[in-house]
A protein has these predicted regions:
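Extracellular serine-dependent O-acyl
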Residues: 20-48
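Histidine/acidic-residue-rich catalytic or RNA/ligand-binding cores of hydrolases
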Residues: 8-10, 47-50
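Histidine-centered active-site loop/cap adjacent to the catalytic His
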Residues: 49-96
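Conserved, well-ordered alpha-helix/loop/beta-strand core segments that scaffold catalytic motifs
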Residues: 1-30
Length: 107
């Protein structure tokens, strides 16, 4: 979530969403690529305890991601990529970024 907070503070959100859409469309054209997106795992993303630094998850979260990939969870397809990107955009454009820092101060 700190990554998205940085994008928001720097005015880079829309550029990030556009880049993600372009990259997704290009990768979906590759027959030998499977693309996964876990930006909708809000309980993980929005909890700072799940990170080892500003952008990287703790090892146990990385293990969960590997389990999701093995199970096929989060697979992006031509049929679902636009709705996933729109859902992602909706959350991150409207997220209360101040709340993540307040929650950690109160603990």
């Amino acid at each position: 979530i700190c990554f998205w907070d940085f994008q928001n503070q720097e005015g880079l959100m829309m550029r990030q969403f556009e880049a993600e859409q372009i990259a997704t469309e290009m990768l979906l054209d590759c027959a030998n690529v499977k693309l996964y997106n876990f930006y909708d795992k809000y309980d993980i993303i929005c909890n700072l305890d799940n990170y080892r630094d500003r952008e990287h998850y703790a090892p146990e979260i990385n293990s969960k991601i590997l389990q999701w990939i093995q199970a096929g969870d989060g697979l992006i397809t031509r049929d679902n990529y636009m709705s996933k990107l729109e859902q992602e955009k909706e959350l991150y454009l409207n997220y209360d970024y101040d709340s993540i820092y307040q929650a950690n101060v109160e603990q």
